[in-house]
Every structure is written in structure tokens, then in C-alpha cells.
């Protein structure tokens, strides 16, 4: 096909992967990317964590908050008056789906469910953790050799570094203490180590965190020919995917600045708008596979904060090492992440994904004079991520008779943990207590976060090996029964996982984009 047009719905790391891979393999193509939210940074899709000014960073995060956003409330047709939020407050840069106002979703069993509405999507706000899936987390119908290559390419696109902060002696001391506690129980290659992160280490020891901008790469470089073939339209809402039978013809879009609607013809449409809004768009377009919205999973998370014990730490690090760590941290005080360690998922010994993040301060205020409020050796914030095993009953459904705040069929989420998850949560909580005692003293006891807190929502457009009604997409991310409709994101992951899913979803997107490129006549395919 000569000069094909590809429409991409969503500007996060997954949509950006499709744009990059397709234009690199089909350079005569035209890619138009649509984003309902605003552009936050001069470089489209950059991580807001790279913004040095705290006020500017706060402004960027607020602009991402959809119905709660300030600067764009009225231009988006959202009342400027206060919206009453539900029981939980969304994380900075995100907005609750069930926010308590007119047109909010119904998610009492999944109350912390949230989204980001901005150029770069969650990639503008994420923690940049990029562990690889392992054991049963991997997709069984993708061959191991191909999977390893896909993960390798995903790491390149995201600028993954496996040893960020590895030169931190404080971080090394934390690893040593955890290894003493758990090392003998863990399989070879899956012991305590540094957490792979997406970003580029800087000479001063800080990190320039990766967002969708690094995935887009040459598409944002005005000197690159590929940039001439790429268009990003922010504040543009895709209302529907238009169909002619089982073939997509394009998308109906609304300019949120003017309210005007138009049709954009496309030879291929990629829907990568997140695990709730992508199936919502499909539903609104009349694309309604039996599995759409079902098999919702995330990661139950148990968290705590521990004050590091000076005597324990001094077994592996000196006061001079601590002073050097604090001096380095002073160079980037607005970024709370320093040394980041982990214990990866493994089976059957350790079906959890553990992150241990060092910080010289707690993530919450402490009254002066209270125990450990001024702990010289600092703190670690620890989290055990666990599996949610897929069930058809865990689902987001859509009501054609009740519009949400944007005029789409409104969402309702039904979700429950079972005895299977409860058992793993209990085991993880006990392990977290062991980890805390090995490092110091708890200043925040282990606690299970509300459902939806992980932001790692999966399964609602799951891929499958056969079209048997239990999946939405084929092994190359094409919606079953449609010739040129492709979906992307964490929603495609069909397995129970414990690790941060971004790297896995980018790898899946690379596979899907290569398949599309081949069918469009790519010379590289």
C-alpha cells in the first residue's frame, strides 16, 4: 500500500511505540496521533519528573487531571466549580474514574482507579520501573526466542538501564541486608538486585527520566525525515472508530478547543488509550467482543515505610558514604527517588515483585520529635506487588443509556479479591515485615492499598491464541474479526503478573507494529 495513513488513539508509551516502529519500517506512511489531554512540556511526552521547578511540575500534573484539571476545565466543557471527590484522592497527575461528580464512573469495588489525560499519558508521571516478565508472567503463545528479542527492543525504546544508582553505597548496603534475610530462599538469577529503570543517567548522578518522548525519538526531531510524516494533535478526542462492515475506515474526532467534529480517514487504526478508555471507545464504536472489558487484573500492593537502622547500615556503609549520598541527592531535591532495589518475581519461591526505594525523607510529614522523624540514615519505602488471577467476573462494563462526563457510555467496575489473592497477600505482608526488621524500624506499618492503587490495569482487551470468546485480540494485537483495527496497552496482557507492565506492553506493541508494517509492505518485515 502506498502512502498509508495510520491513526493512533492515545499518546502514551504504547501509542508512541506504534508510531515509531511503523514509521521506521514504512517511512512513506503518515501517522496521526490523537490525544484528548493537553501537552504538558515543551518536548511532547516528556516526564514531568524532569521539570526542575516545583511550581511548574505541580502545574503540569494538574493539567493532566481530566475532570479535575484547572486551566482547561472550561475549554473542555467541565464546570469550574469544585467537584466533590469520592473517598480516595488520585495520585498526582491522575484523576479518579469514580470522582464523585456528574458523569463519573461507578467503581465502589475499585475505588482508586485513575487515569492521566495528557500528551504522554501515564508515561509523563510513571516511576519508570521496567522489570521484565518472567516464568508464568510471560505470554505462552509467543516463542521464548522471539520474546527475548522483543523485550530487548522495548528496552532500547524506553532507554532502560539495569544498574541505575548501582554506584550508591547506601543502596548497596540495603541490598546486602536484604540478601542476608532472603538470599538463600531465592533462585539463582532472581535474587536481590537493582531495579531496572527507564531513563538516562547524568554525569552528576541524577537521571533524566524517560517518557513517551524517548520512545518517539526521531519523530520529534525536526531534522529527521520521519518527523515530517508524524502529526500529534493534543486536546483532540476520538469519539468513535468508524467501520464499514469489518473494516475500519477512520476515526471521528472532536477538537476540544472549538468543539468541532470531523472525520479522519485511516488505513489502520490503533487504539491505545488505556485499559478503561480503550475498551470504552471500542464499545462506543459498536466493536463489542464477548471478552471486552472482562478479565480485569491489576497488582494488589502492600506497602510500608522503614527507618534505616544506623548500626545495621554501618556494617556495609560508612558515614562518609552516607554524606556522599546526601550530597548527590541535594543536586536534585525535587526528585524523591534515589537508590532503588528490588526482589524480582520468581516461581514457585517468590511470586511477588518487590521494590525498595531509598529516600532521605518520608513520603508523609512526621511531627518533629516523634520517633525516627529525623533519622540520619534515611528511610526506605517498600512495596510488595502481587498477582491478581484473571476472572471473567472482574470487569468494566458500559451503559449506553448513561453518558459519562465526556458523553461516552459510562463505566461500571466490578472487582473482587479471592481466597487465592488473600493467601498471597498474607504471605507478602509477612515477608514485608521480615524485610522491615532486617533494615530497621517501621514508621508506617504494612498495609494493603485500596483496589486500583497500582495503576497497572490489565486484561480488559486481552490477547489470545484463538478466537474462542475469551480474548479481544489475536497474538499480534489485532481485534478478532476486524481487518485493520489494532489495540495496545497493558489491557492486552492475559496473564497474572506481579511486575510493572510497561516494558512488557511495549514489547507486545513492537510485535503488533511489525505485523502491521509487514502488511503495509514494509521492506524490513
Show the residue positions of the predicted features:
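FAD cofactor-binding and catalytic pocket of flavoenzymes
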Residues: 90-115, 289-292, 301-411, 417-419, ...
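A conserved FAD-binding loop/helix module that cradles the flavin
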Residues: 495-516
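A glycine-rich dinucleotide-binding beta-alpha-beta segment and adjacent secondary-structure elements
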Residues: 231-234, 239-244, 411-496, 502
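Conserved redox-cofactor binding core of oxidoreductases
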Residues: 71-74, 79-91, 105-108, 112, ...
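N-terminal Rossmann-like FAD-binding beta1-loop-alpha1 element of flavoenzymes
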Residues: 4-33
Amino acid at each position: 500500500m502506498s502512502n498509508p495513513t495510520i491513526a493512533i488513539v492515545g499518546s502514551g508509551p504504547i501509542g508512541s511505540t506504534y508510531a515509531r516502529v511503523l514509521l521506521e519500517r514504512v517511512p512513506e506512511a503518515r501517522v496521526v496521533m490523537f490525544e484528548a489531554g493537553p501537552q504538558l512540556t515543551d518536548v511532547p511526552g516528556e516526564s514531568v519528573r524532569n521539570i526542575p521547578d516545583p511550581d511548574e511540575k505541580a502545574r503540569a500534573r494538574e493539567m493532566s487531571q481530566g475532570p479535575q484539571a484547572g486551566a482547561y476545565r472550561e475549554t473542555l466543557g467541565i464546570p469550574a466549580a469544585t467537584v466533590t471527590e469520592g473517598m480516595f484522592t488520585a495520585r498526582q497527575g491522575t484523576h479518579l474514574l469514580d470522582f464523585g461528580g456528574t458523569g463519573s464512573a461507578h467503581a465502589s469495588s475499585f475505588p482508586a482507579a485513575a487515569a492521566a489525560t495528557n500528551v504522554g499519558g501515564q508515561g509523563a508521571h510513571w516511576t519508570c520501573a521496567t522489570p521484565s516478565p518472567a516464568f508464568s508472567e510471560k505470554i505462552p503463545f509467543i516463542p521464548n526466542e522471539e520474546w527475548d528479542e522483543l523485550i530487548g527492543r522495548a528496552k532500547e525504546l524506553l532507554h532502560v538501564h539495569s544498574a541505575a544508582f548501582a554506584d550508591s553505597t547506601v543502596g548497596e548496603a540495603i541490598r546486602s541486608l536484604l540478601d542476608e534475610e532472603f538470599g538463600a530462599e531465592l533462585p539463582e538469577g532472581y535474587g536481590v538486585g537493582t531495579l531496572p529503570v527507564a531513563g538516562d543517567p547524568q554525569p552528576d548522578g541524577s537521571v533524566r527520566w524517560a517518557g513517551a518522548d524517548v520512545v518517539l525519538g526521531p519523530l520529534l526531531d525536526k531534522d529527521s525525515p520521519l518527523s515530517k510524516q508524524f502529526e500529534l494533535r493534543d486536546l483532540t478526542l476520538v469519539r468513535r472508530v468508524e467501520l464499514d462492515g469489518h473494516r475500519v475506515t477512520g476515526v471521528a474526532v472532536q477538537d476540544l478547543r472549538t468543539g468541532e467534529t470531523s472525520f479522519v480517514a485511516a488505513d489502520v487504526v490503533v487504539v491505545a488509550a488505556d485499559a478503561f478508555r480503550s475498551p470504552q471507545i471500542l464499545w462506543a464504536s459498536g466493536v463489542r467482543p464477548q471478552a471486552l472489558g472482562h478479565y480485569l487484573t491489576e497488582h494488589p500492593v502492600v506497602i510500608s515505610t522503614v527507618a534505616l537502622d544506623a548500626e545495621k547500615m554501618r556494617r556495609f556503609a560508612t558515614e562518609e558514604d552516607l554524606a556522599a549520598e546526601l550530597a548527590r541527592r541535594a543536586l536534585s531535591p525535587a526528585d524523591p527517588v534515589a537508590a532503588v532495589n528490588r526482589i524480582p518475581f520468581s516461581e514457585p519461591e517468590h511470586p511477588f515483585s518487590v521494590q525498595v526505594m531509598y529516600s532521605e525523607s518520608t513520603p508523609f510529614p512526621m511531627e518533629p520529635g516523634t520517633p525516627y522523624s529525623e533519622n540520619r540514615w534515611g528511610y526506605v519505602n517498600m512495596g510488595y506487588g502481587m498477582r491478581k488471577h484473571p476472572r471473567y467476573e472482574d470487569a468494566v462494563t458500559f451503559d449506553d443509556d448513561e453518558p459519562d462526563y465526556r458523553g461516552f457510555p459510562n463505566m461500571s467496575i466490578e472487582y473482587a479479591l479471592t481466597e487465592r489473592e488473600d493467601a498471597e497477600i498474607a504471605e507478602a505482608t509477612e515477608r514485608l515485615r521480615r524485610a522491615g526488621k532486617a533494615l530497621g524500624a517501621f514508621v508506617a506499618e504494612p498495609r494493603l492499598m485500596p483496589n486500583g492503587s497500582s495503576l497497572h490495569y490489565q486484561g480488559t482487551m486481552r490477547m489470545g491464541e484463538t478466537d474462542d470468546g475469551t480474548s479481544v485480540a489475536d497474538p499480534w494485537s489485532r481485534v478478532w474479526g476486524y481487518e485493520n483495527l489494532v489495540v495496545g496497552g497493558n489491557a492486552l496482557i492475559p496473564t497474572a503478573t506481579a511486575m510493572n507492565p510497561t516494558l512488557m506492553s511495549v514489547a507486545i506493541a513492537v510485535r503488533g507494529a511489525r505485523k502491521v508494517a509487514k502488511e503495509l509492505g514494509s521492506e524490513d518485515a
